[in-house]
A protein has these predicted regions:
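Conserved beta-strand hairpin/beta-sheet module of binuclear metal-dependent hydrolase folds
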Residues: 1-51, 147-159, 164
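Short Pro/Gly-enriched beta-strand edge/turn motifs at strand-loop
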Residues: 2-8, 107-108, 128-131
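Divalent metal-coordination and catalytic microenvironments
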Residues: 6, 24, 34, 44, ...
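Residue-level marker for buried hydrophobic side chains located in beta-strands
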Residues: 31-33, 62, 87, 155-157, ...
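Active-site HxH/HxHxD metal-binding segment of metal-dependent hydrolases
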Residues: 37-43, 49-123
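Metallo-beta-lactamase
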Residues: 38-39, 132-139, 143-209
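Internal catalytic-core helix/loop-beta-alpha segment
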Residues: 116-139
Length: 209
């Protein structure tokens, strides 16, 4: 689903789950925000082809956090996809993503996905891609959870800091949130943003509420 020019909400299905990575692109490059479950690299390629963006244009991956449904296809992407790709994540989730520590919510997984994080992001940082991507450190769901704000299209990419149902925001998903108080504080960072669209990884697009 097109959110704005050069901003596409992808839809991936895995068992009973529907998840929504985001693809940003312009004439020069593309940015993928989150990579789905393990084994979904082919699904991502299909979605990119649907949008009309070649995988060869993919130069940047931004991971909102360490959970397996967000980092799952990172290894395949790095091995089979693109050369010299930059992978961004917050320092507090980096060691989990790289496999140095067991994933906080997926300790039962014997061989969890892992991949090299090339670049660390910090709160308030602006990445110079596709019109500018502002990083918001929004811990609670995980220690290093980040959300992204696209000023050009007034779009908030909320990751798992919130969920939505049928276009309505549902707030924090308590059962999968490690620190509820932190998560509540994180939501306050959104109050001063000029937001027209919110995309939740679980639930998809919400507008005007």
């Amino acid at each position: 689903m097109e959110i704005a020019k050069g901003v596409e909400m992808l839809q991936l299905e895995f068992q009973e789950f529907i998840i929504h990575p985001i693809l940003l692109w312009n004439d020069e490059m593309a940015v993928l925000i989150d990579t789905g479950f393990p084994g979904q690299f082919e699904d991502i390629q299909v979605e990119m082809k649907r949008v009309g963006v070649s995988v060869d244009k993919l130069k940047v991956v931004i991971l909102t956090h360490q959970d397996i449904d967000h980092i799952g296809s990172l290894p395949d992407l790095l091995e089979n996809g693109v050369s010299d790709i930059k992978v961004y994540a917050h320092e507090l989730d980096k060691r989990y993503i790289e496999g140095d520590l067991p994933l906080l919510k997926d300790v039962h997984v014997e061989n969890p996905p892992k991949g090299k994080v090339s670049d660390i992001v910090i709160d308030g940082q602006e990445l110079p891609y596709c019109g500018g991507i502002r990083i918001l450190h929004t811990p609670g769901h995980t220690p290093g959870h980040i959300s992204l704000y696209l000023k050009q299209s007034k779009t908030l990419i909320a990751g798992d800091s919130m969920y939505s149902v049928n276009g309505k925001l549902g707030g924090i998903h308590a059962p999968t949130t490690l620190n509820i108080m932190e998560a509540q504080q994180s939501l306050k960072k959104y109050l001063n943003l000029d937001i027209e669209s919110v995309v939740c990884y679980h639930g998809g697009l919400s507008k005007g509420n």
